[in-house]
Swiss-Prot record:
Pathway, per record: Amino-acid biosynthesis; L-arginine biosynthesis; L-arginine from L-ornithine and carbamoyl phosphate: step 3/3
Cysteine-cysteine disulfides: none
Biological-process GO terms, alphabetical: arginine biosynthetic process via ornithine; L-arginine biosynthetic process
Record has Cytoplasm as a keyword: yes
Family statement: Belongs to the lyase 1 family. Argininosuccinate lyase subfamily.
Membrane-crossing segments per the record: none
Source organism of the structure: Mycobacteroides abscessus (strain ATCC 19977 / DSM 44196 / CCUG 20993 / CIP 104536 / JCM 13569 / NCTC 13031 / TMC 1543 / L948) (Mycobacterium abscessus)
Protein known as: Argininosuccinate lyase
Subcellular location: Cytoplasm
UniProt keyword annotations, A-Z: Amino-acid biosynthesis, Arginine biosynthesis, Cytoplasm, Lyase
Length: 473
């Protein structure tokens, strides 16, 4: 006959669950990650029980001493879940009772449920994980800013639709990848403000009748406040879904950067060489240097998106309050964090060690008639309507393409035939350096504007590192 050993329930039942049910319910293989937080929260809960008069000073002291010893044993690996333990909560209660006895250890469960307990622990774990992820993202931003600083004047082809568009600074392009990553960290900072609300004290769903103080335990655990609604506190996982979205968005932003690096490293582009330490070879082709980090970033982004999608599907259509479906909320987030913790240091190292071939980029910058817009805007400055100037620039491209020359190589006669006010003076703006320098409005690709952008990125990076200081990591 099966028993309820290792469970936090059982009095209602004549026997234990069927083996298949026990196997299905078991979660220690993943929720053991919450064990340090469970012990920390149990110490705080014991203090609240004492404040409510439900423990004596001696009982509180024994509980805290037992929990601290249990925490050391968990950290060292001396104490691990048993096969009979259903979840992290039951395993730790068993461990506590082994250390302080059932009379003392059995008192800790008063006034709390696994429902409010796990909702709190999951928030604690995620807040710390988000801090670590933020640091990793900021390391990638730092690498991008450093590369931008090392190449302040390098000009490259700017592209739209992956076709030649306009010349831009390499630094401008690199900082364009830094901006969304900074926004991702901003999102995590904003997310933390909403997540710093403690469900502890909500009980199963209705709150506690034992005179406990949810605000006291919230502050003890580093939250800003206790939840306003006990039903919402135990049943909502929007904080997890929101974190999952930001993690997926980080992956998407890294994937876009990775796609550029992959393309730039091809023979056809030839913009960069990958450092040997951050690339791999082929088992059959001796010449290969493969961008595995960038490719894995693309691949893992699909995994991050899948984790978010799976969690959202789990959350839909659940009635209030807690449902066992929510056992499935943690593994997707645990996996997303694990994948980003693998990926982010590798991406930072890859970016920091890229060797750019700036002469090659400068050579290709005017290819594909990327100065056609400069020609049109020169005509606008002569008082010609842009519609007319656009048509004239397009015709100039057609004529130059037919001759196999650049726009600057058209003769004065060819310019005049295209439009009477299009003269040879236009050649003054038909250089990549002049084109880049002319884009000097805020956010533009002119060197002084890009230098300002880099300073803003570095300033924001430093602010975000300071805001991230609450996370022990």
């Amino acid at each position: 006959m099966s028993t309820n050993e290792g469970s936090l329930w059982g009095g209602r039942f004549a026997g234990g669950p069927a083996p298949a049910l026990a196997a299905l319910s078991k979660s220690t293989h993943f929720d053991w990650a919450l064990a340090p937080y469970d012990i920390q929260a149990s110490v705080a809960h014991a203090r609240v029980l004492r404040k409510a008069g439900l423990l004596t000073d001696e009982q509180l002291g024994a509980l805290v001493e037992g929990l601290e010893q249990l925490g050391r044993d968990v950290a060292s690996g001396v104490f691990v879940p048993a096969d009979t333990d259903e979840d992290v909560h039951g395993a730790l209660e068993r461990g506590l009772i082994e250390r302080v006895g059932p009379d003392i250890g059995g008192r800790l469960r008063a006034g709390r449920s696994r429902n409010d307990q796990v909702a709190t622990l999951f928030r604690m774990w995620l807040r710390d994980a988000a801090g670590r992820i933020s640091e990793g993202v900021l390391d990638v931003v730092q690498a991008l800013a450093d590369q931008a600083g090392a190449h302040p004047d390098a000009i490259m082809p700017g592209k739209t639709h992956l076709q030649a568009a306009q010349p831009v600074l390499l630094a401008h392009h690199l900082l364009a990848h830094a901006q969304p990553l900074l926004r991702d960290v901003d999102r995590l900072v904003d997310w933390d403000r909403r997540t710093a609300v403690s469900p502890y004290g909500a009980g199963a769903l209705a709150g506690s009748s034992l005179g406990l103080d949810p605000d006291a335990i919230a502050l003890d655990l580093g939250f800003t406040a206790a939840a306003d609604n006990s039903i919402d506190a135990t049943s909502s996982r929007d904080f997890a879904a929101e974190a999952g979205f930001v993690f997926a968005m980080i992956g998407i932003d890294l994937s876009r950067l990775s796609e550029d690096i992959i393309l730039w490293g091809t023979t056809e582009f030839g913009y960069v060489t990958l450092d040997d330490s951050w690339s791999t070879g082929s088992s059959i082709m001796p010449q290969k240097k493969n961008p595995d980090i960038a490719e894995l970033a693309r691949g893992k982004t699909g995994r991050l998106i899948g984790n978010l999608t799976g969690l959202l599907a789990t959350l839909k259509a659940q009635p209030l309050a807690y449902n066992r479906d929510l056992q499935e909320d943690k593994e997707p987030l645990f996996d997303s964090v694990s994948q980003l913790e693998l990926l982010l240091p590798a991406m930072a190292g890859l970016v920091a060690t890229l060797r750019f071939h700036t002469e090659r980029m400068a050579q290709l910058a005017p290819a594909g008639f990327t100065l056609a817009t400069d020609l049109a805007e020169w005509m606008v400055r002569q008082g010609i309507p842009f519609r007319v100037a656009h048509e004239a620039a397009g015709e100039a491209v057609r004529v130059a393409e037919a001759r196999g020359v650049g726009l600057e190589d058209l003769t004065d006669e060819e310019f005049a035939a295209i439009h009477p006010e299009l003269t040879g003076d236009v050649r003054a703006v038909l250089t990549t350096a002049g084109s880049v320098a002319s884009r000097d409005a805020r956010g533009g690709t002119a060197p002084e504007r890009v230098a300002e952008q880099r300073e803003l990125v570095l300033a924001r990076l430093n602010v975000l590192r300071g805001q991230n200081g609450r996370h022990p990591g």
